A protein has these predicted regions:
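Acidic/histidine-rich catalytic neighborhood of metal-dependent amide-processing enzymes
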Residues: 1-59, 65, 89-92
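Solvent-exposed, polar/charged alpha-helical surfaces in well-ordered, non-transmembrane soluble domains
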Residues: 5, 9, 65, 69, ...
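Sec-exported extracytoplasmic/periplasmic mature domains
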Residues: 9-16, 68-76, 101-105, 144-149
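Structural recognition of the beta-strand scaffold that forms the well-ordered cores
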Residues: 19-25, 101, 106-111
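Flexible glycine/proline-enriched surface loops and loop-helix/loop-strand junctions
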Residues: 46-54, 82-85, 123-128
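Short catalytic/ligand-gating loop segments at beta-alpha or beta-beta junctions
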Residues: 74-93
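An extended, acidic, His-containing surface patch that forms the Zn2+-binding/catalytic region
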Residues: 91, 98-100
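His/Asp/Glu-rich mid-to-C-terminal helical/loop segments that flank catalytic regions of hydrolases
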Residues: 116-150
């Protein structure tokens, strides 16, 4: 995350405005099971790992309903708005969006939940044949619809 941290810091120092930073973090794995950083999340979200998650800080959270609605036309979409730059749920900070949260920018992580779902994550077995390319195609179509409307 060194590059995203450097960029977010530079943008803040230059007082640059940014509508939304989007981090695409693992987008193509589905599974019959899904894990969560907190067990209570299972009651709100699905037991099956066949959805894409939109994880956003408070400012970007205002965009979540529209983004989720547009993406949801293509792929099952779940939202997770996180206050306080996600500090209460450290696992949601493990990607390039978090330095933007720290600098006060609106940022969104789009994810299939990576290691919470995919046993191949950062393993030699993480190959194209382990991915669900139909799901990935629907994610891309959903991103096109959602982000194109911003």
């Amino acid at each position: 995350m060194l590059g995203s941290e450097a960029l977010a810091t530079q943008l803040r120092a230059e007082r640059q405005q940014l509508k939304l930073m989007v981090s695409l973090e693992m987008l193509a794995y589905t599974d019959d099971e899904q894990n969560y950083p907190h067990k209570a999340m299972r009651a709100v979200y699905r037991d099956t790992g066949d959805f894409i998650a939109l994880v956003a800080n408070t400012g970007a959270g205002l965009m979540l309903p529209g983004l989720a609605q547009r993406m949801g036309r293509h792929v099952t979409t779940k939202v997770l708005p996180v206050p306080s730059a996600g500090r209460a749920i450290p696992d949601v900070r493990l990607s390039d969006h978090s330095p933007f949260w720290d600098q006060g920018y609106n940022a969104l992580m789009v994810t299939d939940t990576s290691f919470m779902r995919n046993p191949h994550y950062h393993q030699m077995s993480d190959t194209v044949d382990s991915l669900d390319l139909d799901f990935f195609s629907r994610v891309v179509d959903g991103l096109d619809a959602a982000l194109g409307a911003l």
